[in-house]
Amino acid sequence: MLQAILDFYHSTGFYGLNMGSIIMMLVACVFLYLAIAKEFEPLLLVPISFGILLTNLPFAGMMAEPLLEVHEKLSASGAHLYTAHTAEPGGLLYYLFQGDHLGIFPPLIFLGVGAMTDFGPLISNPKSLLLGAAAQFGIFVTFFGAIASGLFTAQEAASIGIIGGADGPTAIFLSSKLAPHLMGPIAVAAYSYMALVPIIQPPIMTALTSETERKIKMSQLRLVSKREKIIFPIVVTILVSLIVPPAATLVGMLMLGNLFRECGVVGRLEDTAKNALINIITIFLGVTVGATATAEAFLKVETLAILGLGIVAFGIGTGSGVLLAKFMNKLSKEPINPLLGSAGVSAVPMAARVSQVVGQKADPTNFLLMHAMGPNVAGVIGSAVSAGVLLSLFG
């Protein structure tokens, strides 16, 4: 009887608990609290944090790889033949994770984002493209910083640097190509910092701007014709794909989704891309990204370095956008609110909303949201192009 009780205990998760898994489960619970109680981007943090919880449950085997049996036999000619079959299937999340590993989910997310995005503010004010480009500066500064640390190779440093674009799908796509073994920490860092945009950005924005600058009101954007909105995704796809071919996957899917939105003749495809498809992929992507956050993968020096470099990249991207906007404001005949520069990171629409909130704290009658969407959507294109550049250099 005692042996039966011991055998049962050894089969439970309590027997397999260790300090590492307990720490990671506590981290998951903190993320769940932030997502549910504080509403910090719950669409991202709820599936990610639950994935962290699932993967750190002892003996659950959610990310277990399939067990293969290999058999050897001789052919009639005497040659050695090998056959393999699955002796035991892998865990559910292992199979879903192949969408991350093979680079399938990120482009599909971009398809949905394109279907939801109005590029009108960018087309109306092309100068905002510069702010989106400036915000990518953090990617390359952090790339060199990661190499200088001596902890990472060039491929790993490129994958870490892309966190500065504040674009989770792009970070997953690039790291799956250049540093698959670091995809988990990089993806969790990228999505976590995206969710924490309302906390990370405002102190940087207020530190780099005066109250007078934050009160600057922008002139009304011009109306953009339907023809312009249809031509835009086609032209961008052609130009970006010719200049940076590795960026074609992400930019092409982004612009296809946007063409669904703007052409007006494929309403069903637009609706599916921006609702059902992106919601399903967000669930799969979030849970599987979280499931890579095992105690063995996360509780080590390299992971802490990735988290530290990631937030530095994000901060530099935010700051460089604000500083360029201040510089442009000096040269431009029309006033430019420097708060728009921080929206150049590609966390859509969180970064644009932060610009609006910080601006309204200085002047409640100031409405910056639509103006901030210009650099915000430019940042989406910019992060995809940056990923393409890094992939062409180190892929």
Curated annotation (Swiss-Prot):
Gene Ontology process terms (BP): sodium ion transport
Q: What is its EC number?
A: 7.2.4.3
Instruction: Provide the catalytic activity annotation.
Output: (S)-methylmalonyl-CoA + Na(+)(in) + H(+)(out) = propanoyl-CoA + Na(+)(out) + CO2
Q: Which GO terms describe its molecular function?
A: lyase activity
Q: What is its main location?
A: membrane
| PTM remark | The N-terminus is blocked.
Enzyme class, one word? translocase
- Protease listed as a keyword: no
> How does the protein's chain sit in the membrane according to the entry?
Multi-pass membrane protein
GO CC terms in record: plasma membrane
Q: Which domain of life is it from?
A: Bacteria
The record's subcellular location field reads: Cell membrane
Note whether Ion transport occurs among the keywords.
Answer: yes
Residues crossing the lipid bilayer are 17-37, 43-63, 103-123, 128-148, 180-200, 230-250, 278-298, 304-324, 374-394
Function, in words = Tunnel subunit of the sodium ion pump methylmalonyl-CoA decarboxylase, which converts the chemical energy of a decarboxylation reaction into an electrochemical gradient of Na(+) ions across the cytoplasmic membrane, thereby creating a sodium ion motive force that is used for ATP synthesis. The beta subunit catalyzes the decarboxylation of the carboxybiotin carrier protein and the coupled export of Na(+) ions.
Task: Say which family it is in.
Answer: Belongs to the GcdB/MmdB/OadB family.
Question: How is the subunit organization of this protein annotated in UniProt?
Answer: The methylmalonyl-CoA decarboxylase is composed of four subunits: the carboxyltransferase alpha subunit (MmdA), the tunnel beta subunit (MmdB), the biotin-containing gamma subunit (MmdC) and the delta subunit (MmdD).
PANTHER family attached to this UniProt entry: OXALOACETATE DECARBOXYLASE BETA CHAIN 2
Its protein name is: Methylmalonyl-CoA decarboxylase subunit beta
